[in-house]
């Protein structure tokens, strides 16, 4: 078995994904470069297991620290699930606060698309009042209004490496001990679109 994308926990299987800390740091740096300082993390986690949500929150915190922006735990908003409705609920709750964010770093595109809808319904301009960034570069991110700035994993490389690892496991099954579990990171890029002024 080879896991692709997000690893739920250390489970003894090969894994291929991106460097989530670095990717979130770069996405946060992009928001900071646009003058955003009250950046909320939708789907984030401050404490707990070392899953994707925690790794991406760590990258966000690194970028804030490097820019001299104080970390505010109230801007890290956990969600029940990574679906559109959860992103919409989180964005609505953030906009009901007295001290509103000026940007949302959503830990996947589904959350970001839900957030965009909630912001639209409240009359908030994106990218004017807030910037929004997602993760994964799903197809809908290109067609939303505004189109969504997102972290795009190198999906072709993920597939290539995963097939290679799987074939090594299959071919090695009859020839002796299995190689140790491998964790392989592939590249990513920030795709700047309309939700951050692109």
Mark where each language-model region is.
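Bacterial carbohydrate/catabolite-sensing allosteric modules
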Residues: 1-3, 7-198
């Amino acid at each position: 078995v080879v896991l692709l994308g997000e690893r739920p926990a250390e489970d003894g299987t090969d894994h291929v994904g991106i460097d989530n800390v670095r990717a979130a740091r770069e996405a946060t740096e992009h928001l900071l470069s646009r003058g955003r300082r009250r950046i909320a993390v939708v789907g984030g986690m401050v404490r707990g297991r070392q899953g994707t949500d925690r790794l991406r929150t760590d990258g966000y915190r690194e970028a804030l620290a490097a820019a001299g922006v104080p970390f505010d735990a109230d801007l890290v908003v956990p969600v029940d699930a990574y679906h559109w409705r959860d992103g919409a609920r989180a964005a609505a709750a953030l906009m009901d606060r007295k001290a509103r964010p000026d940007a949302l770093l959503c830990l996947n595109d589904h959350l970001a698309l839900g957030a965009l809808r909630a912001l639209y319904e409240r009359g908030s301009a994106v990218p004017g009042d807030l910037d929004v960034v997602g993760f994964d570069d799903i197809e809908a991110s290109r067609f939303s209004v505004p189109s969504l700035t997102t972290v795009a994993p190198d999906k072709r490389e993920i597939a290539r490496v995963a097939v290679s690892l799987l074939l090594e496991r299959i071919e090695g099954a009859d020839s002796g001990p299995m190689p140790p579990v491998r964790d392989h990171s592939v590249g990513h890029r920030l795709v700047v679109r309309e939700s951050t002024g692109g």
